[in-house]
Structures are given as C-alpha cells and as structure tokens.
Amino acid sequence: MEPNSLQWVGSPCGLHGPYIFYKAFQFHLEGKPRILSLGDFFFVRCTPKDPICIAELQLLWEERTSRQLLSSSKLYFLPEDTPQGRNSDHGEDEVIAVSEKVIVKLEDLVKWAHSDFSKWRCGLRATPVKTEAFGRNGQKEALLRYRQSTLNSGLNFKDVLKEKADLGEDEEETNVIVLSYPQYCRYRSMLKRIQDKPSSILTDQFALALGGIAVVSRNPQILYCRDTFDHPTLIENESVCDEFAPNLKGRPRKKKTCPQRRDSFSGSKDPNNNCDGKVISKVKGEARSALTKPKNNHNNCKKTSNEEKPKLSIGEECRADEQAFLVALYKYMKERKTPIERIPYLGFKQINLWTMFQAAQKLGGYETITARRQWKHIYDELGGNPGSTSAATCTRRHYERLILPYERFIKGEEDKPLPPIKPRKQENNTQENENKTKVSGNKRIKQEMAKNKKEKENTPKPQDTSEVSSEQRKEEETLNHKSAPEPLPAPEVKGKPEGHKDLGARAPVSRADPEKANETDQGSNSEKEAEEMGDKGLAPLLPSPPLPPEKDSAPTPGAGKQPLASPSTQMDSKQEAKPCCFTESPEKDLQGAPFSSFSATKPPLTSQNEAEEEQLPATANYIANCTVKVDQLGSDDIHTALKQTPKVLVVQSFDMFKDKDLTGPMNENHGLNYTPLLYSRGNPGIMSPLAKKKLLSQVSGASLSSSYPYGSPPPLISKKKLIAREDLCSGLSQGHHSQSSDHTAVSRPSVIQHVQSFKNKASEDRKSINDIFKHDKLSRSDAHRCGFSKHQLGSLADSYILKQETQEGKDKLLEKRAVSHAHVPSFLADFYSSPHLHSLYRHTEHHLHNEQSSKYAARDAYQESENGAFLSHKHPEKIHVNYLASLHLQDKKVAAAEASTDDQPTDLSLPKNPHKLTSKVLGLAHSTSGSQEIKGASQFQVVSNQSRDCHPKACRVSPMTMSGPKKYPESLARSGKPHQVRLENFRKMEGMVHPILHRKMSPQNIGAARPIKRSLEDLDLVIAGKKARAVSPLDPAKEASGKEKASEQESEGNKGAYGGHSGAASEGHKLPLSTPIFPGLYSGSLCNSGLNSRLPAGYSHSLQYLKNQTVLSPLMQPLAFHSLVMQRGIFTSPTNSQQLYRHLAAATPVGSSYGDLLHNSIYPLAGINPQAAFPSSQLSSVHPSTKL
C-alpha cells in the first residue's frame, strides 16, 4: 500500500459471509501514521462546517466482493450541537449520541479525522497514569488484560497494541473516552476515594473493578453519554453509506449485504457473486432470469469486473459459463446413472452448483479443500446459514454427490475411486429417502389407520363384519323388541367404549379370527380382542376411540364389541329385556342389523356362552361397552337428554347415534359412543384417551392400564378372560346396573375412561353374563330386550330428562333389574349396617375369592342360575340364591382363572374386583338379603319413590336397599340381580360412562362442568350401576322404581332405578353422607342439591372425570369410606353428609389426584373393606336421595 493508503492492522477477527472483520486499521494523519482500533474514540468533523464530534469506532470490515473497506462508528455531539441544545439537565461532561450508527468508508472516515480539534475544551481532565508506574509489579500486563477483556470485548488486541506501541500512540495527546453514565459515576466516585493517592493506583485490579479507569494518554478527557438524538443532516452526508451496512442477523444476511449474495439468495442464483456490487445489482435481473440455479463463477465475474468489461457482457459471460457447466454436469451425471434430480438446500437457500463448482476449483478442487478443511469457505460462498454447525460436512457431501464425479471426469480421474464419504452421502440420500418414505409411510399409516377406523365405522373388519352382522341382528332384534330409537344413544355410548376396545381389540381379534362370523366366533373374537386389548393396554383402545368417537370407525370396533356385547346382551335380554336392549340396542342403534344377526345367532348363544366364557374378557368388555350403548334412550329420550345435558358428550354421542344408529350400523356408532363418553363431560379438563389411560393405569395400577378403563379391574385386566368370567358372574347381577350405569356413564367422558378400562372387563363380565343369560335373553321375548334397552335408555333419558311417564313400561324390567339389583343391594345393605358391614365385608371378601375362583367354572351354572333367576322373577330369593350360587361358582371359576387377576389388587372397591365384589356382595346379600333385602326393599322402595320424585324417578339400585324388605325387593333383586350384577359390572366398566349419563339426567348436572355434580339420578344411576353390583339394596327401590320405570322405562327407567336406589340408599343408610363428599361419586341429585350448593355448577376438578368414574368405577371408590365410617353416623344425616361433603370436597380426597385418592383412601379402604367400594357410591346414592 502507499504510505498514505489505508491498511488493516492485526489479524482478522471474524469472517461472515462476504465480510472479513478487522480490529484496527492504520492511516496517516498529518504525515504521521496513526492506528485506530475498535473501541477507540477520536474527534471527527462530518463536514468542514459541522461541529466537532467524537466518533467511537465500533466495527471494521472489508467486503470481499466489492473490496470495500468500511467502518461503523457511533457519533457523540455536545448538547449545544444538537437540535435541542443544552439545558440545565445536561452535565458539563455530557455528550449526546446520534441514535443511528454511521457506515463510512475508511477513506472518508480518515478525511473526517483530518481536522483541527484544538478548540475542544469539554470533558473531565483525567490524571493520566504515568508509564513509569507500569514498570513495577506487572501492572502494565494487568492493564492490558483488563483492556482486552473489558474494553475490547475479549478480542485479542495484543498485535494491535504492539503496533500502537511501536507507533508511540500510547502517548497520544488527543485521547477522549466516552463512558456510560453509570461508569462515569463510578469513575468519579473512585477518583474521590483515591484523590490523595498516586494515579498509578488506578491500575490496581480492585480500583479497576470498582470503576477506575487507567488512562495512558497524556491528556485524557472523560465524558459520558446517557441520551441519544436524531441528527437532522447526517443522513444527507455523502460519506455516510448505510447501504453497505453488514447484514449480520437472522438468516444469511450476506445475501442482503452483497448484491450477489442477495441474488443468489433470492434464488436467481446470480452469476455475479464475485462481481462488484454495482455489476451484481445490474446483472441481478439476468441472473434471476437465468433458469439455472448456479451463481456465476466468482472468478469469472471478478475477472470481468476487474477488466471493466461491460457489466451486461460480464453477466452474460457468467451466465453462459454457468449454463454450459450445468448442461455438461447434468448430462454427465445422467450418463453416469446418477442423475441430479433435486438440488439440495444448504442453510436456507438452494445450492448453486455453478457457484459451488467455481468456489471449489478456486480453492484447488475437492482433494485440496478436503485436505485443508476449507469446505466451510465453500459453504460461505454458497451463502449458507452462518449458524450451521455442520456446514463443512454437508457441503462436502453434497459436492461429492453432485459435482465430484464430474470434477473427476474433467480432470481425467474418472477411475479414481470416489471418497469413502460418498457412501455416507448416498446413505444420507437414502436416509432422506427413507425419512421421506417414513414420513409418507407414517402418513400412509395414519391415513390407513383413519381409513381403517372409517372402515371399521363403515365396514367392519372380517371379524368386525361378523360382529357387525351379529350386531346388526342384535340391533334388528333389539329394534324389533324396542322398536324405538332409544338404543341409538346407548349404542353410541356403548360403541364409544367399545370403539376404543374394538379399535385396540378388534385388530387383534381380526388377526386372531377375523373370519369368525358366528356370534360365538365373535364372542371368542371379542374375548381375544379383550385379551389383546388388555395386553395392549387401554391405551391403544383409548387412543383409537378418540378418533372413532366422531367417526363411525370407532363404532365399528364397537361393533366388534357389540357382537361380544350382543351375546351378553342377548343374555341380558333374556334376563331382562332392558339389559338385553341395553347391550343389544347399541348394536341395533348403531347397526340396526347387528341385532338381527344376533337373533340369528341367539340359538348359538348357549354354545356361544361356552365360547364366550373363554372369550368373555373381551365379550364382557364389549358387553360393557355395549351395555353403555344398551343404556340407550329412545331417540326422543336421547334428544331430550342431550338437550337437558349439553354437558354430557355421551348424550351428544347419543344424538350422533340417533342419527348414525338410524343411518349407520352400530359399528359406526361405537367410536362415537366411546369418544362422547370419554369426552362427554363438559369438563374443561377433558383428557385424551391416552392421558386418561395413563391416569387410570396410575390409579389402578398396571392392570388398569392393560384394558380396564375403570382401573379397579386393572389386575383383572391383564387376565381379562378370568376377569371377564368374574365380571360375568358379577356382571350378571351388575349387568343391569352396569347397563344403567352405562347410560349414565355415557354422559361422563372421565367415567368412560375408567369404564373403558373396566369396560373390557365389563364387556367380559357382560359377555359371561350374556352367556349366562343368553338363554334367558334368547328365551325372553324381544319385547323384553326392547324393554330392557328402552328401560336403560329411559334411564338415561330419565337421568337426563327425569321422566316418570314411562315408568310403568319399565316396572317389569325394573322389577327384573330390581331383583338383580336387590341381590347386590342386600349385600351392600349388610355392609351399611354397622354390624353387618364387617361380617359382610368378610363374607364379600370370602365370596370374592371363592366366587372369583368359581366364577369361571360356575359361569354356566351362573348363567343357568341367572336364567333361572330372571325366569323366576316371582321367586327373587331363589333367583338371588341361584344367582349367588352361580356367582360363587363362577366366581370360583373366575378366581381360578382370575387367580392371577386376584393376585392383582383385590380391593373390592377396585373395578376389577367389583365383579368379584358383586358376587361376594351377592353372596353376602343372599345371606343378609333375607332380612335386610326386605328391609332395604321397602326402604328403597320408599326412597326410590322419593328419589324418583326428586330426580331419579325409579330407584333401581340403591346401595342401601340391602336392608329393604327382602322378599319382594329380594325377588326384584334376585330376579334382577343377575341383571343388576351385570349392570353393576356393566356400570363398573361403564362407571366412567355411567356418571355421564346420570349427569345428563339433571339440568344441574348438565350445567355442572364436573361429573361430581351429576344429578342425584346420575349419581344414583352411577351408584346403581356401580354400586348396584356391590349393593343391590336398591333392588327394592328398583322394584318400586321398577314399576315406575316400567312406565319411565324409555324415559327414565335407568335414571329412576338408579336414582331410586340412590335415594333409598341415602334414606335407608348412613351412606348418604358420603354423597356430599364426592358429588361426582354420588348421585347427581345429591350432588346437585347438596354439592351444587357448595360446588359451582361449572366446578370441574381436574380429576373430575376420574371422580365421576370412581362413582361408577370400582377402580376409584370415590369415597371408599371405611365400613366403620359408613356404619358410624358420619354419613347418617344428610346435613352431616353435606358438611362432610363440604369438607371432603374442599379437602384433598376430591381435590387430590384420582390416583392419590385411590391409593390413599380408596385402595387401602377397598383392600380393608370391600364395602368401601360400594359405601362411597352407596353413600353418595343415599345422601343424594336424602337431600332430594
């Protein structure tokens, strides 16, 4: 460079795109060389007429493409030189900064610095640190380190400082420093503290740290800046060229900074990368017009620009070269059988093959670049993202794949093996392809899944088809029996849980025996499905159901369940038209044809029962699901319920089912049913099936996660078949309850989750129940089935509509249910009697184990006894005994089969054991039902009437019915008990779903965001469903309500029965107190009347659905109160219960996580007291009635 020319001092300190950053530059001022480095302050005049100002050099860089030497500086003016002028607020040492930094070419900046600044008199005259002071103690090194770390932002300025020292700049007279106001204040403070000390103390590290400034210059001037202003004329200065400002932020700014870069980034792949900015800008259009992506060769562009060829000619030449290169490259690569199909992206822009090739050749080719590790330079030339950490590798691999073969070809090195990295390159490509295929495959899978779901909804799988056909038969039969659209809602609800199960279980089933078209086959399929579902866990079912809920695909899985449910449905139909209808009507509603297929299959049902016993787990689950659907309201009822309980998604699903059931097969409705159940609640915290599954699995343990949405059966879930048999036994008695509970459960998504967990189990139980009762159902008139499903639908409708009009029609069914319910309730009544509670608990526990073992073995016997019980409704006690006997036998079978399941938590309160509990309860109920059932029957009849009057018109299952008059109620309980057990099992499984239906019952529930606020009927239904299995005591209420239900059958049968039972229980027992505690756990009316007063209608606990489920779900004994607590007067009085509810509602039991509640209070209590599972529900049922 010439003596006066500018030159960089020191090594570059940064590289970014086309910019090379430096720390200092040297120029000649008044004939003497001077070095300005980053952070230096110096006087400048922007124009000869402008006032003197201070410039802070902040950035120095060279733009490689245009060879521009640029600087960025911040200017400081005295207050009087600003438009506003100086005022009293300005300090004597204050300067004001220009808000915008100025970009100035170095030559112009040097011109600005050439001026006379002797007139500057402002600033604090600081005492310079004498250089001699630095000689001692290495203070100079310390000061240099301080300046490097603090003043120079950590950049290594040693070389610059050395240059400055060589020039003697340390002694520069004109040295100005502008501090921030805080720095200035600290500096002044330090000066004051060391005013009597030598200036060398400022070099002390502590003095420096405390704000001291060691100034080396002879005449330092300290100023501070705390404000900025907009300079009016600075923009007009010709020297200021902001257009050259470096683009350093965000994505490749280089493109913006450098016209070439911009062109290349703009995707025109300018050929002008190396051309001067002007040339580049002019050539942009051409480059962009160029079809080829590659940028022009930098070298060629530079040469042309340097040669000052016409800009257009330069651009054209670059473009021509680029075109020729691209043509040759593409041709060669195509001939080489490695055509270039897609140009990859580097950073944020597509690779310009021409630019990449030119840059590589410029640096010596592939071998040289790789040896020197200069691929990052190529990446920079391509304008890649500066922040990329894999730029070099990616660039090299792209080059190896796209250009290296051609480069070798040009150099005659074709035979030279390509770098070993190329395979990696290919691998990357293959990986990309694989990723693409994976992505597309995932999409396909998702789409296929969706299609499968839709197909399931619309066209069941082979197994599903058989199931659908059976379901269609079922539906046809149910429709024939019911001749009402009620089944539609219930099937929807049912279908939803089933949909989940079917989705999860159906696939397995289809694999297992997709071709099985017989109901028996379907039962086995359902069993397999249930087992697979259990193995797979509820998660798959739950996840898939969410999709089906709105779709009919979920219903199709439901259809698979429906066939399973249909056997039990048929059994239920035999036992009670209502249960049958409940299970069947879903299929009817959903498929309409499935039932007819079932009717066709009915004859095989007996043989199917055996097959189903094996298949029961799935069948029970499907049955439970179907049961949910079976608790169908007439389409009118459903609509009414939907209207009444907008909160209940299940109701919505019922509406959907109404449409779909009428329009489509039950399979379609299943998904819908399930999802509405899962999402039915207006709960703000609706959980996804997976989340619910996780929550449930946490609550109930691994078994819960396996396939019981309810959670209490989790252990049984893993052994679904055993559970299914067990559930069949308990499901027979609980079947009616569970079906009713299914209705209510439908209205609660949270309940549904539990129900789904238990639903498999419930389906299994149902299946076994259906197997047991298949003959009854088969033998029973279609009217019975219709009546039952209608009755359950009515219960649903009643629970939502609180209708009493159809109770007469329901009475018979209710009686049947009441009988079945009464069996369990008497047992529960014993629980509730303080003397009986412990003995009953022990008996129940004993029966549970015995019955579990005997359940499966005795399933046929149970079916026979169940059939006998249903057939001999006139002899409720006999039925009860038979049912219990069969229950015990089946329980034993189940226990044998479920030994493993029993190994799992045997909490009677747990859903899995609820079946066992039911049987145990039934056994206890048998023993205690004689006196207590009569007692409970009368009590519950009265209570059920009252509760009916309140909200639940007919009290089917009041946990407290145990003490009711035993004979008639017992007959109801016994004849209905198998049904009740089924209902209970059904409700256990549907416990989650059931609360929803209950909530649908009452407007309060509808308004309530949390299931806890389920109407008393809802709770009653839930309790009836869930508790009924454990406590048939409501059977008398059922009986009483059964009559009303007969009339309410289509409108309020289920609701009434449940409500009645709950009411009876509340009145007849101390249990009512529990109701206030967990509104979701207790009958809706209680919660509505008692809790609603305490809990906002919209109150929704995060665990609300779980709580609701607990009401229905054995998994969570909502208030698993100790039997002692139950016996005590704690829950005796409604007022006490209300208070207790307040406290409990306020307390953690409800507030705490469902798992906590379960594990802390429910499981221990459940484990200790099988009653606990029932007491809370019963209590809730009782108390709501009392409140009512």
From Swiss-Prot:
Induction: During smooth muscle cell differentiation in vitro. Upon adipogenesis. There is a cross-link at residues 130, 446, 494, 496, 767, 774, 803, 810, 893, 916, 920, 935, 988, 1000, 1013, 1055, 1070 (Glycyl lysine isopeptide (Lys-Gly) (interchain with G-Cter in SUMO2)). GO terms for cellular component: nucleus. GO terms for biological process: adipose tissue development; adrenal gland development; cell development; cellular response to leukemia inhibitory factor; face morphogenesis; fat cell differentiation; fat pad development; female gonad development. InterPro entries: ARID/SWI1_ChromRemod (IPR051232), ARID5B_ARID/BRIGHT_DNA-bd (IPR030408), ARID_dom (IPR001606), ARID_dom_sf (IPR036431). Pfam families: ARID. Residues 265-275, 594-609 have a biased composition (Polar residues). The gene is Arid5b. Widely expressed. Expressed in lung, heart, small intestine, kidney, muscle and brain. Also expressed in spleen, thymus, endocrine organs and in uterus and testis. The keyword Calcium does not apply. It comes from Mus musculus. The modification Phosphoserine is found at residues 264, 1032, 1133. The modification N6,N6-dimethyllysine is found at residue 337. Transcription coactivator that binds to the 5'-AATA[CT]-3' core sequence and plays a key role in adipogenesis and liver development. Acts by forming a complex with phosphorylated PHF2, which mediates demethylation at Lys-337, leading to target the PHF2-ARID5B complex to target promoters, where PHF2 mediates demethylation of dimethylated 'Lys-9' of histone H3 (H3K9me2), followed by transcription activation of target genes. The PHF2-ARID5B complex acts as a coactivator of HNF4A in liver. GO terms for molecular function: transcription cis-regulatory region binding; transcription coactivator activity. Keywords: Activator, DNA-binding, Isopeptide bond, Methylation, Nucleus, Phosphoprotein, Transcription, Transcription regulation, Ubl conjugation. This is AT-rich interactive domain-containing protein 5B. Disruption phenotype: High rate of neonatal mortality. Embryonic growth or birth weight are not effected, while lipid accumulation is severely reduced in brown adipose neonates at 24 hours of age. Mice weigh significantly less than controls from postnatal day 5 onward. Adult mice are lean, with significant reductions in brown and white adipose tissues, and in the percentage of body fat. Mice are also resistant to weight gains and obesity when maintained on high-fat diets. Belongs to the ARID5B family. It is found in: Nucleus. Residues 251-278, 413-614, 958-978, 1030-1066 are annotated as: Disordered. The ARID domain mediates the interaction with DNA. Residues 445-459, 470-484, 493-504, 526-535, 1036-1048 have a biased composition (Basic and acidic residues).
